[in-house]
Swiss-Prot record:
Family named by the database record: Belongs to the IspG family.
Enzyme Commission designation: 1.17.7.3
Cofactor binding summary note: Binds 1 [4Fe-4S] cluster.
Gene3D superfamilies: Dihydropteroate synthase-like, Sulfite Reductase Hemoprotein, domain 1
Chain positions recorded as [4Fe-4S] cluster binding sites: C275, C278, C310, E317
Name of the encoding gene: ispG
Organism: Ruegeria pomeroyi (strain ATCC 700808 / DSM 15171 / DSS-3) (Silicibacter pomeroyi)
Enzyme class: oxidoreductase
Annotated metabolic or biological route of this protein: Isoprenoid biosynthesis; isopentenyl diphosphate biosynthesis via DXP pathway; isopentenyl diphosphate from 1-deoxy-D-xylulose 5-phosphate: step 5/6
One Pfam family of this chain: GcpE
Name the UniProt record assigns to this protein: 4-hydroxy-3-methylbut-2-en-1-yl diphosphate synthase (flavodoxin)
Chemical reaction(s) catalysed: (2E)-4-hydroxy-3-methylbut-2-enyl diphosphate + oxidized [flavodoxin] + H2O + 2 H(+) = 2-C-methyl-D-erythritol 2,4-cyclic diphosphate + reduced [flavodoxin]
A GO molecular function held by the record: 4-hydroxy-3-methylbut-2-en-1-yl diphosphate synthase activity (ferredoxin)
Length: 375
């Protein structure tokens, strides 16, 4: 739960779920909602894949998924796992043996698709490998690849069909006394995804992996994911998320964190609050924010920064942020620290000065956290 006793209307009450482990990352229960992404390199290109995994981890990814379409990819996975700073999920479709090979290669989790993994006997083989090698499993239902008997029964991909697919495979895992699993019921349609996720959340206590599949490019996919995932998270549904974009995986991680930050569910780095700018702005807000986003990427400490072009809303927004800058006149503006007006600063020096103030505040917050942990 994101707890705010002063403003209870900001609280999000998370659905109670079992906790499993994906490598060293807890998923479900009271664990923080983890952020995932997926590589888009050829898995057999180990150097490129490892570089992408490391970049995603640096951006904050807790878990990274890698596709394992063939034997060569399964062989490459062993080295990728060895070089990865975060747990690796092996994405398995069609060939159940790839799941067995991925478990042997050290994958922390196996994603299997009920629509194409094959018979229950094949699933049992994957379960055995997962148990032997300490892997968890994600049952990854997708509207675009539902089982034939469910499409015949329901006529089209629908929430009921997706939930039934997921529950059928949960039963297979449970019948084999395997409980380290999570589930997803993804679709590219926001309405279908939301309804399916609500259905599966009511039907099981398994940890839920949230995603809108094939969401689109950076802008359209971000909007679709923010609406779909944001609404479900606000309802308390979701234990780990992956934003699917036709873009660099690092962008998926950034968008994922922004969605969580907007709901107060997880915080990482500087949350910049800025105005869209208008004729009243005392400096170029858009260019300033673009520059600050790049200059402050290295800050991992959760904190807030307001950049407002004029005094209409600037002082009020600054009251609620760690550092703030409000445009004034005559080529300068007011710097706010801890919600209070502190000193004036010229527009010319403003960006460098704000970076200094943010770094100073981040260091102070880190020191306070370290001291508290040492008590």
């Amino acid at each position: 739960m994101s707890h705010n006793p002063v403003r209870p209307w900001r609280n999000v009450y998370r659905r109670k779920s079992r906790q499993i482990m994906v490598g060293n990352v807890p998923v479900g229960g009271d664990a923080p909602i983890s952020v995932q992404t997926m590589t888009n390199t050829l898995t057999t290109d180990v150097a490129a894949t490892v570089a992408q995994v490391q970049a995603a981890a640096e951006a904050g990814a807790d878990i990274v998924r890698v596709s394992v379409p063939d034997e060569a990819s399964a062989r490459a996975l062993r080295e990728i796992v060895r070089e990865s700073p975060v747990p690796i999920v092996a994405d398995i479709h069609f060939h159940y043996r790839r799941g067995i090979e991925a478990a042997e290669a050290g994958a922390a989790c196996l994603r299997i698709n009920p629509g194409n993994i094959g018979s229950p006997d094949r699933v049992r083989e994957v379960i055995r490998a997962a148990r032997d090698h300490g892997c968890s499993i994600r049952i990854g239902v997708n509207a675009g690849s539902l089982e034939k008997h469910l499409l015949e029964k329901y006529g089209e991909p629908c929430p009921e069909a997706m939930v039934e697919s997921g529950l059928e495979h949960i039963r297979i895992l449970q019948d084999n006394d395997f409980h380290e699993y999570k589930i997803s019921v993804k679709a590219s349609d926001v309405f279908l995804s939301a309804a399916a996720y609500q259905g599966i959340a009511e039907a099981t206590d398994a940890p839920i992996h949230l995603g809108i599949t094939e969401a689109g490019g950076l802008v359209s996919g971000t909007i679709k994911s923010a609406i779909g995932l944001g609404n479900l998270l606000w309802m308390g549904i979701g234990d780990t998320i992956r934003v699917s974009l036709s873009a660099d995986p690092v962008e998926e991680v950034k968008v994922g964190y922004e969605i969580l930050k907007s709901l107060g569910l997880r915080h990482r780095g500087v949350n910049i609050i800025s105005c869209p700018s208008c004729a009243r702005q005392g400096f170029d807000v858009i260019k300033t924010v673009e520059a600050l986003e790049k200059r402050l990427e290295h800050i991992k400490t959760p904190m807030s920064l307001s950049i407002i072009g004029c005094v209409v809303n600037g002082p009020g927004e600054a009251l609620m942020t760690d550092v703030g800058f409000t445009g004034g006149g005559a080529g300068s503006g007011m710097v706010y620290l801890a919600g209070k007006a502190s000193h004036k600063m010229s527009n010319e020096r403003m960006i460098d000065h704000i970076v200094e103030e943010v770094e100073k505040k981040a260091a102070a917050l880190d020191a306070a956290s370290a001291a508290e942990a040492a008590e």
